Amino acid sequence: MNRIALVFLYSLFLFNLAIGRVESQTCQCIQPDPSMLNCLGYDSKLQADTIDEAIASFPDLSLNDDVANQKFSTADVGCVTKECQDCRKDMRKQLQKVGLLAKDINDIVASQVDSNSTCTKYGFTRQQQKKSHDDDDDDDDSDSDESKEEEEKKKRDRKHRRDKRQAITQGSQNNTDPNLIGTRFTISCAMKGVSVDPTGTVSLCSSCWVWRQLPSNYRPQYINELVCDNTDSDCLSGYATCSVGHRTFEAIRNDNGVQTQVTLTAGSYCECRISKSSSLQSLVEGTGISGTYNPLSNHTTPV
């Protein structure tokens, strides 16, 4: 074999090796039977077989920020930067807070996210940093009493929704869907009307970023989901309702040693849908506004 051919083969080897490294960051594989060559591939951004894998690879689905997600998925594979390490530390604290990760007896880390964290990967870390910044501003602020009163009312409303959501989370999160396999843990939620998009557009529905832990006989064990906030299911001031959209995924179920590949569903997005009989239907169809507006008194089937 001549020298040119050897150089070509070596270059091809390096190329395939590089491609394999990139793919390994997003595609993992479960081998149900070690004696067989076939395996079940999965996207590590949406599924994980261990909690550490989920912490390392799950993006915040409540943030429509592809640039930030791409930055964290490729720029720091070894997690050597302070920002990456802060993100993992903040996520472990959050998982302990919601009950998905048990606190170690030797864990001396505070339960609250560090306000000095450099992590911008997650919505809850951004909120904590913003809250810390706002508190600092309040110390030097000379706004009127009326403005402060209005801001305090907003804070009380947000706290009420958060407390209500946490009560549901700490209780039985699956009551809203008795057919759901596994247990959902709410990581954070994004309120409707709050900008979560780099373009400045706002969402019509409040949504929650949740991690679902499947029963112990399922692999991969953890699912990354986005669902509607079940404490705030209305949109457009009650003229419409929020509905969750689903995606399907594959998993392996072990039934007393018998491995079975199964198809399950996961929450993928939350959208605002109007009732078919709503006066807003003409607005959706592009024919203008007709009729009077009667807010939904009950949740009819949306279109």
Curated annotation (Swiss-Prot):
Keywords of this entry: Glycoprotein, Signal
Record field: compositional bias (Basic residues): 155-164
Bias (Polar residues): 167-178
Sequence ranges of Acidic residues compositional bias: 135-149
Region (Disordered): 124-179
Region forming the signal peptide: 1-24
The organism's place on the tree of life at top rank: Eukaryota
Glycan-linked positions: 116
Database matches in InterPro entries: Cystine-knot_cytokine
PANTHER family named in the record: PROTEIN CBG09882, PROTEIN CBG18546
Name of the protein in its database record: Uncharacterized protein T16H12.9
